[in-house]
């Protein structure tokens, strides 16, 4: 995922957490906020309490990033995906499905924004 398509700084995440629309599922929580970049920007959060080891945490983050890459999000949105406990043992297919369903719910709630 290109650098321009990622949320990188703390204030970018803070804005999405404070003002974004929350879409919760059993595996992930999406926070979606319109942006002015002209393309989607993604952020991923996997907590240390959820996955204590760095290897497992980064593995889950990579899997979420790939699921997001394969999901269609064509509009200008900041999207933060936060892993939930069920995501640890979920298959990649389940993670991809959860991301896709979350984005389609976001599109409906934003009036066709994703």
Language model features: what each stretch is:
Residues 1-114:
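Positively charged, solvent-exposed patches that mediate nucleic-acid binding
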């Amino acid at each position: 995922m290109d650098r321009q398509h990622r949320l990188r700084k703390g204030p970018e995440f803070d804005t999405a957490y404070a003002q974004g629309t929350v879409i919760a599922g059993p595996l992930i929580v999406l926070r979606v906020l319109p942006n002015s970049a002209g393309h989607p920007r993604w952020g991923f959060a996997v907590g240390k309490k959820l996955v204590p080891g760095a290897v497992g945490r980064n593995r889950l983050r990579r899997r979420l990033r790939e699921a997001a890459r394969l999901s269609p999000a064509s509009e200008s949105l900041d999207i933060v995906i936060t892993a939930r406990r069920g995501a640890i043992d979920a298959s990649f297919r389940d993670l991809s499905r959860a991301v896709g369903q979350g984005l389609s719910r976001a599109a409906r709630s934003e009036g066709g924004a994703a």
